[in-house]
Amino acid sequence: MYEKLCEPTAYQKEIKLYAGHGATELSERIANVLHLQLQGLTLNQFANGEIYARFMESVRGDEVFFIQSIAGKNVNDLLMETLIVADAASRASAASFTAVIPHYGYARQDRKASSREPITARLVANLLEAAGVDRIITVDLHSGQIQGFFDIPVTHLTALYLFGDYFKNKDFDWNNTVVVSPDMGRAKVAKKLSDYLGCEVAIAHKSRPKHNAAEVMGIIGNIKGKTCIINDDMIDTAGTLVGSITKLKEMGAGDIYVSATHGVFSGEAISRLENAPIVECVVTDAIPCPVANTPGSKIKSITVAETVANCIYNVYTNHSVSESGAGNSEM
């Protein structure tokens, strides 16, 4: 039985996908793309609110991929769930644990904007590493520099070109269409999208006096009579966004479309968008949105499943993500 232990082996580590409560539907879509089944994982809460996790089968020597968006009203529970599952995998001798986090919670707290503030995005990175996470896969971080908070590999994917393909299927006059950056910080990304679509770019200039509040001071670029595509990384309360939309309309913009990777949609955000003078608001399924694609709703959703699945495949098979033929998937 043991005579050949000294000989080289061609043992292939098995890939196993698991879903957290923050990405159940997206996890199913990713598994379907990969022709895999989601594996059994017990995730419960005790009566006092503490989280319990247990893998239903052995993960010894396996490549474990745990899919979890850290967003929504239970954002803290979802973060804790991720940490506990990572610890369970480490203690069960998994070969590696990759946290697939389509939406990275606390990403906006990436610097000290005022004195005596924390840098919570860095804290979350520290917690994930301490829990035993070996690799991160995420989509459209609020700030790309967050990758530098980690001492483990981070694959930063983008949904930008998924939006590009979505709008290319629209019957737009591209000579009369403009991509609008919601602020100066997104100007580079807006330029990438405008180049991909073959149209012009404009930039909104804002003043931000407090959290979740900003005032549009003006627009750099010509938007009068043009179809406008506003692109951002996330929509939270949508108050600032609706203010930008109103400003664009006052300046003579034509049809307005909104696109954002992460539809956080806090408070009255969905109601604000449904009543705003826009044609559509397109988000991805990085964060679940029950009203998206329902009849009569302006909220539309496209999936990042294939982009994420392709990344998982290339990580597992040790192929390059950026050179795999997946197109423009890595930011």
Region annotations inferred by a language model:
Residues 1-331:
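PRPP-associated nucleotide enzymes
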